[in-house]
Amino acid sequence: MSITKEQILDAVAEMSVMDVVELISMMEEKFGVSAAAAVAVAAGGPAEAAEEKTEFDVVLSAIGANKVAVIKAVRGATGLGLKEAKDLVESAPATLKEGVSKDDAETLKKDLEQAGASVEVK
């Protein structure tokens, strides 16, 4: 009996964020590919280059001295469970959120820095 695409999708939907990240890295190794999105460069004018960025990624660079406070802040910001938040914090540098607005990214950065973490907004 073969597994359907729907069953695979349901199984992935039930995984934690850390499990999905691990699955992606295993797939990258097995198939020799990268999950990074391919960027096509279009021959556009300078107006396109001047466009302001609207989506930002929040990256935890370093934990700092107060690891417990950082884990609490990550849990609050991401909705992860305690173990997943701890694993994510300990794997720094790690991307916490992707594609968030500038205001949300700056708020998250401020909260995490108050907890003692080093954070970058890209």
UniProtKB/Swiss-Prot annotation:
Keyword Transferase recorded: no
Transmembrane segments: none
Keywords of this entry: Ribonucleoprotein, Ribosomal protein
Family matches, as SUPFAM superfamilies: ClpS-like, Ribosomal protein L7/12, oligomerisation (N-terminal) domain
GO biological process, one term: translation
Molecular function terms from GO: mRNA binding; structural constituent of ribosome
Gene3D superfamilies named in the record: 3.30.1390.10, Single helix bin
Keyword Cytoplasm: no
InterPro entries: Ribosomal_bL12 (IPR000206), Ribosomal_bL12_C (IPR013823), Ribosomal_bL12_C/ClpS-like (IPR014719), Ribosomal_bL12_oligo (IPR008932), Ribosomal_bL12_oligo_N_sf (IPR036235)
Record GO cellular component, one term: cytosolic large ribosomal subunit
CDD domains: Ribosomal_L7_L12
Assembly description: Homodimer. Part of the ribosomal stalk of the 50S ribosomal subunit. Forms a multimeric L10(L12)X complex, where L10 forms an elongated spine to which 2 to 4 L12 dimers bind in a sequential fashion. Binds GTP-bound translation factors.
HAMAP family linked: Ribosomal_bL12
Function: Forms part of the ribosomal stalk which helps the ribosome interact with GTP-bound translation factors. Is thus essential for accurate translation.
Protein name: Large ribosomal subunit protein bL12
Organism: Sodalis glossinidius (strain morsitans)
